[in-house]
Amino acid sequence: MRKSMKSLIFPDVNVWLALNYEKHAHNPFAVKWYDALPQSTAFVFCRHTQLGLFRLLSTEAVLKQDTMSQAQCWAIYDQWIDSGHAFVAHEPPGLEAGMRTRASGASATPKLWADAYLAAFAEAGNLTLVTFDRALAREVKGAIHLV
């Protein structure tokens, strides 16, 4: 994880989608929030959020006639990276321990895996998680719940 004086913002997959797809129901909220951030704010992708964004942008059931090609997905991602407003973070030390703490229950909860990963990544990396998911926001100290 690079060190800097920048605020490190870690959007979940749905926030990334809303920032990059104008027809997303939460796009106006996401863009208003984004526009109010200081110029020095840095956005963080992890491999999970990168692939999740690509998957949603290229899924017809999500974007209907606006479904994007792989090349278009890469172009959106490259704009973030090339602009210097975002970077890809490697998995921070302590991630797996944090994930195990959150996802070691006796019940089968398939939807918990990704949330546990994102929460643990944010905490281990000292990142500010941003999400539309109220329950996920409650799991991470300092998380931002949009909407």
Q: What do the PLM-derived regions correspond to, one by one?
A:
Residues 20, 57, 140-141:
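Short, flexible helix/strand-to-coil boundary loops that buttress conserved ligand/catalytic motifs
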Residues 42, 98-100, 144:
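A generic "structured core" feature
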Residues 83-134:
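Active-site neighborhoods of divalent-metal-dependent phosphate/nucleic-acid chemistry enzymes
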Residues 45-52, 72, 114:
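Short, conserved alpha-helical segments within structured domains
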Residues 1-10, 14-45, 60-72:
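Short, well-structured N-terminal submotif of metal-dependent ribonuclease cores
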Residues 15, 49, 94, 135-136:
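Alpha-helix capping/helix-boundary segments
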Residues 141-147:
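Active-site regions of enzymes building and remodeling cell-envelope glycoconjugates
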Residues 18, 54-55, 78, 82:
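Generic alpha-helical structural context detector
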